Amino acid sequence: MATGSLIKIDEEIVTSAVASVTLGGTDWDSSYDVYMVQYLNVVPVTDNQEVRMRFTEGGTPNTTANYDYAYKIIETLAAGFEDFPATNQTYFRGVRYGNNTGEAGNATLYLFNMNSTTEYAFYTIEENAYINDAATIAGCTGGGVLTVTGTARDGIEFSFPSG
């Protein structure tokens, strides 16, 4: 097992609209305990879309209703703070992103227990987004867990409801 440093396992550079992006799969290296994933300047096709995330098993996203998550969202809107818990979902979700000029989302995730067949896989996230031309800025911190065992996870898929 490697220790003490970050090792790049996979990278995807997207330059035009795609339905989803998957990291891992055949590029997955199962010799690590923790994986860091970052995405930068992500923009949906349709305005005001939440980023969705699923763990993959055998390169295929797990679409079962076994995703639980909780976030604290901080926005520059009047609401200010928002708690966002959900259970028995078919994906993890992040904050909404805009698609106008200058709008984008960024995040850093840490993935844990991905290679275990007996423990739940889970993640933590730090996310930020400039969401609309009214200058709404959102930040998010939280995490989630896939409450099913039996299969090792080998990656993560990102998508938007609109593609």
Ranges and model annotations:
Residues 2-163:
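Surface-exposed molecular-recognition determinants
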